[in-house]
Structure formats: C-alpha cells, structure tokens
C-alpha cells in the first residue's frame, strides 16, 4: 500500500528488506505451484543456477489478473506449451545466447510463435536453432497456433497436435 502511494522512504536497508520480502513472496508462489521458473541452459550447473530465470504461470487464467488486460496470444501460447513440457521433461531449460530458444527438453529444442506466416518472424525462429546448434544434435520444433508442416530440418506443429503428441507418450509409458 505504501509503495502504491509513493510515500515510503527509501534507504539501502529498506531496499534489501524489500528484496528479501519479494523473494519470500516468489518462493511462496512457487511452493504453492502458482508460478514456475526455469533456468538458462548451461553445461556447468553452477552457471545454470546463477542464470536469470524465466517465470511461467500454472494457469493462463492468471494472465488476466493484472492491470494490463490486453490479450497477447503469443505469451498465452508459450505459457501453455510450458505447462505441457513441464509435466514431461525432467530438465526443462531455455537457451539465451545471441538468440533465445524458448525451451530445451532432453534432445529437442522448442520455439513458440503464435503465427509464423510473416517471413521475418519465420526467419527469426529458424535462426535461433541454427545459431545454437550448428552440429544438429537436437530435434527442432516450432509450436504455432494453427500450422503444421516440415520445413528443412524443422518440424512445425500446431498446438493441438503438440498436446496430443505428449498425451500419447504419457499413455504409452
């Protein structure tokens, strides 16, 4: 309340205290499965632990709780893909080097884009794979809202098929 009113005094000690409170708050949200965080992929575990975290919500409904209620289909789709991958991947990370890869799960790299009809968007998504994995050690997958195709070595999967692919895997195991 004080922060919203803008009348709270600031000091180094209060800033440190504020950081501690926020961390405890974030931990509470994580402990209660409202938010989840993933680390940036790195070959050294200490670097991975120190990396900036990406935050995802356990339910897209929480995206409507904020002040800014404009619908961002790309953010919602990426969050939904996270929810699915988080159920099935033992070590889910993202990659941030020159370009960002949304998810790394075992032997697959995932990019999420609501729509890749625009050539610039398509090239941006493809370039991220090429930049990180020049040796082609991973399977490349782009999850979109409504497109399915195979382009070069990249599988483009519509979200609906992506979900069923993982559900079928779950039934087999």
Regions found by a protein language model. Give the residues of each.
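Short, charged, amphipathic alpha-helix that recurs within catalytic cores of restriction-modification
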Residues: 120-135
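Short loop/edge segments at beta-strand edges and connector loops
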Residues: 39, 96, 144, 157-160
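Nucleic-acid nuclease catalytic cores
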Residues: 96, 135-153
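Domain-level recognition of nuclease-like catalytic cores that cleave nucleotide substrates
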Residues: 146-173
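Hydrophobic/aromatic beta-strand patches that form the interior of the parallel beta-sheet core
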Residues: 56, 110, 141-143, 155-157
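Hydrophobic, well-ordered secondary-structure elements that form the walls
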Residues: 85, 110, 129, 140
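Accessory nucleic acid-recognition modules appended to NTPase machines
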Residues: 1-105
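Active-site ExK catalytic segment of metal-dependent nucleases
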Residues: 106-118, 125
């Amino acid at each position: 309340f004080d922060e919203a009113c803008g009348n709270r005094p600031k000091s180094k000690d209060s800033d440190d205290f504020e950081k501690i409170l926020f961390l405890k708050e974030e931990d509470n949200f994580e402990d209660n499965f409202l938010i989840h965080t993933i680390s940036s992929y790195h070959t050294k575990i200490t670097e991975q632990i120190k990396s900036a975290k990406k935050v995802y919500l356990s339910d897209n409904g929480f995206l409507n709780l904020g002040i800014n209620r404009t619908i961002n289909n790309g953010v919602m789709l990426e969050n939904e893909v996270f929810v699915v991958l988080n159920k099935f991947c033992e070590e889910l990370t993202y990659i941030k080097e020159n370009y960002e890869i949304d998810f790394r799960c075992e032997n697959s790299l995932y990019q999420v884009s609501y729509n890749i009809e625009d050539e610039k968007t398509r090239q941006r998504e493809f370039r991220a794979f090429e930049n990180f994995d020049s040796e082609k050690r991973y399977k490349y997958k782009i999850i979109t809202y409504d497109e399915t195709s195979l382009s070069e070595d990249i599988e483009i999967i519509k979200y609906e098929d992506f979900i069923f692919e993982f559900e079928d895997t779950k039934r087999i195991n």
